[in-house]
A protein has these predicted regions:
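Extracytoplasmic gate region of multi-pass secondary transporters
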Residues: 46-47, 229-282, 340
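Intracellular juxtamembrane helix-capping segments at the cytosolic ends
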Residues: 131-144, 333-347
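Conserved MFS/SLC helix-loop-helix module at the cytosolic interface between two early adjacent transmembrane helices
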Residues: 77-113
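C-terminal transmembrane helical hairpin of 12-TM major facilitator-type secondary transporters
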Residues: 294-339
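Helix-breaking motifs and short loop linkers at transmembrane-helix boundaries and internal kinks
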Residues: 58, 90, 111-117, 145, ...
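A late C-terminal transmembrane helix in Major Facilitator Superfamily
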Residues: 346-383
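Helix-loop-helix hairpin linking two adjacent transmembrane segments in secondary transporters
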Residues: 154-203
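Cytoplasmic helix-loop-helix junction between adjacent transmembrane helices
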Residues: 121-159
């Protein structure tokens, strides 16, 4: 088949060094990192405040689980479209538009009048989040070249920090103001302010880095179909990990507050510890490369064990802090990066982009359905039994599927 080979770009880092000081570059990374941090804060604050939101809107537990994660539908759709949009409008406009978009819909969330309008507003935040994420990583990859791994690792650290601060600060704002709406006003306004600051300070040489390619060469490359058994097994397994994650993130704070009697602040703090664990992603990626693909099995067993303990009536606050942290380390700090690596190594190098899109679609598409189904099962079976199906069980099914994976045909590069 005829494909476009990877394009050769100018040495970006060397050119940038002559026009921007190291201090300025660090400042740009910090600014983008902070904008990415607000992305995570917006995601995580909603489930942390779900008990109060449900009370105000009269939502059932399944409806609450749905609106907590409905944004993932648009993350999948617009993440796929972000490449075309960046080509059409430029990274800078997509980056700023995404940041303003999800911040605006975060700001508008308290103006919802019922379940439908609330779900629509939360879904629309996913549009902005997807565009911002795509643009940030495109800018980082092009600007830093061979050092893109460290730069992207820094972004993941900011995301983990946001996943911690979102629920921790959000629940405290509710406690201080006696209103769950305060967090959405503060986070929304802050996000728009960061967008304005980014528009003023981020130079075109940063967002446009590497966009003057040499002439691409069309070369005949004989490749197999992307749909191999290994890709199917790893992508479905990654999707099952997504079911576990979105079930946990949508209703964990509701469980600790409603069933264990944690205060809203303590429930938010327990959920926020996931973010601290997620900040270990740069270590998890390195460790996964050292241990190899089969390290997935150990991590899946750890995830299943921690998931079981989280929802089985252990009322010690410090224990939930530890368990939620471990969930974050295992899920986002290790399994997310390991599965993305395994999926990419399941196909020809020219098909990596398509394989990654398939994997991310599997991971994110379960979001709204996982939260809703978990809530329905809780109403029918109770928290302990429902969590076996939705949080602890999926990683064990993934163990079975990955045992069928043919590692002898997986690429080692």
């Amino acid at each position: 088949m005829v494909t476009d080979q990877a394009v050769t770009y100018r040495p970006i880092v060397e050119e940038a060094a002559s026009s921007s000081s190291t201090r300025r570059t660090i400042g740009l990374v910090l600014l983008l990192g902070i904008s990415y941090m607000f992305n995570a804060m917006d995601r995580q604050v909603f489930p942390a405040l779900l008990a109060s939101i449900r009370a105000d809107y009269g939502l059932t537990l399944p409806q609450g689980g749905f609106v907590s994660t409905v944004f993932t539908i648009n993350v999948v759709i617009f993440a796929a479209l972000s490449g075309w949009l960046m080509t059409r409008f430029g990274r800078r406009h997509v980056l700023l538009g995404g940041l303003v978009g999800y911040s605006l819909f975060t700001l508008l969330t308290p103006f919802a009048t019922g379940f439908v309008s609330l779900a629509i507003l939360r879904a629309l935040t996913g549009v902005g989040e997807a565009l911002q994420i795509g643009a940030i990583f495109a800018c980082m990859g092009a600007y830093f070249g061979a050092r893109r791994g460290a730069a992207m690792g820094a972004m993941q650290t900011f995301f983990g920090l946001g996943a911690f601060l979102g629920p921790v600060l959000g629940t405290r704002l509710e406690s201080w103001t006696n209103s769950w709406s305060a967090s959405f006003y503060v986070y929304g306004i802050a996000g728009i302010a960061v967008a304005v600051l980014a528009a003023v300070t981020i130079p075109l040489e940063f967002t446009n880095a590497g966009q003057s390619p040499s002439v691409a060469q069309n070369v005949d490359v004989q490749t197999k179909s992307i749909w191999t058994r290994n890709l199917a097994l790893s992508a479905i397994s990654f999707g099952l990990v997504g079911v576990s994650f979105f079930s946990y993130s949508s209703l964990y704070a509701s469980y600790t507050h409603g069933m264990l009697g944690f205060s809203v602040v303590d429930a938010g703090s327990a959920l926020g510890m996931y973010g601290i664990g997620a900040m270990c992603g740069f270590v998890g990626g390195w460790l996964g490369d050292k241990l190899g693909n089969k390290s997935i099995f150990g991590a899946l067993f750890v995830l299943a064990t921690v998931s079981y303990l989280l929802f089985h009536d252990m009322a010690l606050f410090w224990l939930h802090l530890l368990l939620s942290f471990t969930f974050g380390v295992t899920m986002s700090g290790f399994l997310f990066t390991r599965f993305m690596s395994v999926v990419q190594r399941s196909v020809h190098p020219s098909q990596i982009g398509h394989a990654g899109a398939v994997a991310l679609a599997g991971f994110y598409l379960s979001g709204p359905f996982a939260g809703y189904l978990f809530g329905k099962l809780v109403e029918t079976l109770g928290w302990s039994s429902a969590s076996l199906f939705m949080v602890a069980g999926p990683p064990l099914v993934a163990v079975v599927l990955m045992s069928l994976y043919d590692y002898s045909t997986s690429r080692n590069d």
